[in-house]
């Protein structure tokens, strides 16, 4: 990359500042909707809290945001960019060569981040709609929780329903709306604290530590499960690095942190002023004058929708990266907008919708959802910490310093994990089960790929070059196609899968003018699009290594069309004039893509465990996108051939011929 590009990535701008507010901070920016409510309700209500409890809670929130979000993610993790892209899979690609076992924290972290993303829309939208309970004129309608559930589900149906059309047309308003949202948080919090300046004593971490061990704290260390809600969006902040650039996050985060801290302090001040009033409304809405609440609910709903949209888009990106890293099944991906970064995965969209809707119906209130929320993301953060340690060592940090720094964050996050573990019995089990299911699928897919690499045999193309030439020139065979293309992800030098040569020469001899052997390799760089060609000393056998970034679509026909034109223009490939065509001057013949599917046979070499892995992977394949769709071959001529995983395994079964016995009397 050029220095100017790097500078642009680290540079901040006014437009970038606004865009960052709309993309990066949706999750962490809507946490004030429910964090203080969770703390107060778990303590027994507003009338049960003391000044020391409130000061301790605010102190815990401030220092959690400082340690985890500011220091770990903004100051450390943002430096771990993979060609300007962030997130746990981008981080994994930076360190995966350091140890093969690092695939484990990457898979666990990705799975828990996905499962958390399914819960976020339910929590944020429900919390926003519940604010209608505090609106004069509407409170009598929305005191009935069923009406809140119906309204929430309608919003979710619309939100997930528009994903297929792309969200670029509404994405332009995300930034301005979130700027208004954060400004409101800051201003309202500021005015609420004017009468209770003692709130600012919470900056002293003494109050945080005192509360953890105070008898006034009814929940003990488990209070951290509610405190953690304030920083759940930190991982999303890192994942969205590539969308806005490091410089814009550096500039916008101080503004965002100031506004949300003011909001928490303002809610705390309202609680101290009204703890004997008997009011049991959410402090976030109750701390605002009643005549403004309807506008606040509208703004909060928009902010919740924006936060949910960011999580949905992030889930699509996460799954797309996992597919290209070959640790997740292939699902159909579409690009509804002009931007490659704006993608849509139908299966994932409707799975998220189903899980989110079931969460709303099962838990009914935001308070019950909060009881289950946050457990998964603590695991994601722990996995990111593990990968960050290896990244720091790779970048030259002294190992002892890298170990100490990451051990500190791992300890803090492990304490939050233990505090959140109690949520397992209050609904967190649903998120854990979902995460385990995703990890299981990832493990099966990854292990199945390794088994194929272990057993599939390769042959040297040079040894069969003469046979292929004879077949090409043998007019006794009808021309199968002008160009025959084989896709293989296991092509190295001149070695190629035995199944491909078996398809060309044995299964049905395929006579063609040119044989193409294409290997698609996913690179660690997100947006690479390069290729390398080896003609093997011929003009009829072409080996193509196609290098695509892990965020690039693998639409092979488009790339191959460009490669063919380049080879013909350079004279390395003869032109293929067409006698019959509606396109004047067309000099490229027809193509047929041959896809080979390896299936498990009764091979004795496979262990029972390996057979289970391969059979399970085959079952998963039935509900995923076909390679034809994944490689963009829907409008091309495609032949699918099935071969056994182990071609050499030919069993000679004992069998006897029945010979007719002559009649003895004859």
UniProtKB/Swiss-Prot annotation:
Which keywords does this chain's UniProt record carry?
Answer: Cell membrane, Ion transport, Membrane, Potassium, Potassium transport, Symport, Transmembrane, Transmembrane helix, Transport
Which residues span the membrane? 16-36, 58-78, 100-120, 141-161, 165-185, 221-241, 253-273, 294-314, 343-363, 373-393, 399-419, 424-444
Keyword Acetylation in the entry? The reply is no
Q: Which GO terms describe its molecular function?
A: potassium ion transmembrane transporter activity; symporter activity
The record's GO CC annotations read: plasma membrane
What highest taxon heads this organism's lineage?
Bacteria
Report membrane topology: Multi-pass membrane protein
Subcellular location(s) per record: Cell membrane
Tell me where it mainly resides: membrane
Database matches in Pfam families: K_trans (PF02705), K_trans_C (PF22776)
Which reactions fall under this protein's catalytic activity? K(+)(in) + H(+)(in) = K(+)(out) + H(+)(out)
Q: What does this protein do?
A: Transport of potassium into the cell. Likely operates as a K(+):H(+) symporter.
Family affiliation: Belongs to the HAK/KUP transporter (TC 2.A.72) family.
This protein is called what? Probable potassium transport system protein Kup
Origin organism lineage: Bacteria, Bacillati, Bacillota, Bacilli, Lactobacillales
């Amino acid at each position: 990359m050029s220095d100017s590009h790097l500078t642009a990535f680290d540079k901040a701008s006014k437009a970038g500042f606004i865009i960052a507010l709309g993309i990066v901070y949706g999750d962490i920016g809507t946490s004030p909707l429910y964090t203080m409510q969770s703390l107060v309700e778990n303590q027994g209500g507003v009338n049960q809290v003391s000044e020391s409890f409130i000061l301790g809670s605010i102190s815990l929130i401030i220092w959690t945001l400082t340690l985890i979000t500011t220091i770990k993610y903004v100051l450390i993790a943002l430096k771990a960019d993979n060609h300007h892209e962030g997130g746990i899979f981008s981080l994994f690609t930076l360190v995966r060569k350091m140890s093969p076992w690092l695939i484990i924290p990457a898979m666990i972290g990705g799975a828990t981040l996905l499962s958390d993303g399914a819960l976020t829309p339910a929590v944020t939208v429900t919390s926003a709609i519940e604010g209608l309970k505090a609106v004069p004129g509407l409170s009598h309608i929305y005191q009935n929780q069923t009406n809140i559930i119906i309204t929430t589900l309608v919003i979710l149906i619309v939100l997930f329903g528009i994903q297929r059309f792309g969200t670029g047309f509404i994405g332009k308003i995300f930034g301005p709306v979130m700027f208004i949202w954060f400004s409101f948080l800051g201003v309202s919090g500021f005015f609420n604290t004017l009468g209770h300046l003692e709130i600012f004593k919470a900056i002293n971490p003494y109050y945080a530590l005192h509360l953890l061990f105070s008898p006034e704290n009814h929940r003990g260390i488990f209070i951290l499960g509610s405190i953690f809600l304030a920083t759940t969006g930190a991982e999303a902040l890192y994942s969205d690095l590539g969308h806005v650039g490091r410089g814009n996050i550096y500039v916008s985060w101080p503004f965002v942190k100031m506004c949300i801290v003011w909001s928490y302090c303002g809610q705390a001040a309202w609680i101290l002023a009204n703890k004997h009033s008997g009011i049991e409304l959410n402090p976030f809405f109750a701390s605002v004058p009643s005549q403004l609440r309807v506008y606040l609910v509208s703004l909060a709903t928009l902010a919740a929708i924006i936060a949910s949209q960011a999580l949905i888009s992030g889930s699509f990106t996460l799954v797309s990266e996992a597919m290209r890293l070959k640790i997740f099944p292939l699902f159909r991906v579409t690009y509804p907008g002009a931007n490659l970064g704006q993608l849509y995965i139908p299966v994932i969209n409707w799975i998220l919708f189903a899980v989110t809707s079931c969460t709303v119906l099962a838990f009914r209130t935001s308070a019950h959802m909060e009881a289950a929320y946050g457990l998964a993301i603590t695991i994601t953060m722990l996995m990111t910490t593990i990968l960050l340690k290896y990244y720091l060592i790779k970048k030259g940090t002294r190992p002892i310093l890298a170990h100490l720094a990451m051990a500190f964050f791992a300890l803090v996050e492990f304490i939050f994990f233990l505090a959140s573990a109690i949520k397992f019995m209050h609904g967190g089990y649903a998120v854990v089960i979902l995460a385990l299911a995703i990890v299981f699928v990832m493990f099966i897919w990854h292990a199945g790929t390794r088994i194929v690499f272990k057993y599939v045999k390769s042959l040297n193309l040079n040894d069969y070059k003469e046979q292929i030439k004879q077949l090409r020139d043998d007019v006794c065979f009808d021309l199968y196609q002008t160009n025959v293309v084989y896709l293989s992800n296991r092509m190295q030098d001149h070695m190629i899968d035995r199944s491909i040569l078996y398809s060309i020469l044995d299964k049905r001899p395929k006579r063609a003018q040119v044989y193409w052997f294409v290997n698609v390799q996913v690179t660690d760089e997100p947006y690479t699009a390069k290729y390398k060609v080896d003609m093997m000393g011929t003009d009829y056998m072409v080996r193509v290594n196609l290098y695509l970034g892990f965020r690039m679509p693998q639409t092979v026909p488009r790339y191959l069309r460009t490669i063919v034109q380049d080879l013909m223009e350079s004279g390395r490939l003869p032109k293929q004039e067409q006698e019959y065509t509606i396109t004047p001057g067309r000099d490229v013949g027809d193509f047929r893509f041959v896809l080979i599917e390896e299936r498990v046979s009764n091979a004795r070499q496979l262990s029972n465990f390996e057979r289970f892995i391969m059979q399970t992977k085959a079952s998963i394949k039935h509900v995923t996108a076909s390679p034809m769709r994944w490689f963009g071959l829907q409008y091309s001529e495609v032949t699918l051939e099935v071969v056994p995983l182990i071609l050499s395994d030919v069993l000679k079964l004992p069998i006897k011929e029945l010979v007719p016995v002559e009649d003895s009397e004859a």
